[in-house]
């Protein structure tokens, strides 16, 4: 699986994983393997980090926030 393959909306799998509140942190961390383009902007101007902040309460998923901020 190429974690950087875009769909018709310009999104890569990590966009959907961070947008969904039903994700497992381990699934997201798997998608965040070396070479993952985590700053990919979709057709709507959103990055995976943007969707993570949009969909999750502050303080939730600190592990993911720490990963994106390093």
Curated annotation (Swiss-Prot):
Keywords: ANK repeat. The keyword tRNA processing does not apply. InterPro entries: Ankyrin_rpt, Ankyrin_rpt-contain_sf. ANK repeats lie at residues 9-43. SUPFAM superfamilies: Ankyrin repeat (SSF48403). Coiled coil: none annotated. The keyword Transmembrane does not apply. This is Putative ankyrin repeat protein RC0502. The lineage of its organism: Bacteria, Pseudomonadati, Pseudomonadota, Alphaproteobacteria, Rickettsiales. It comes from the Bacteria.
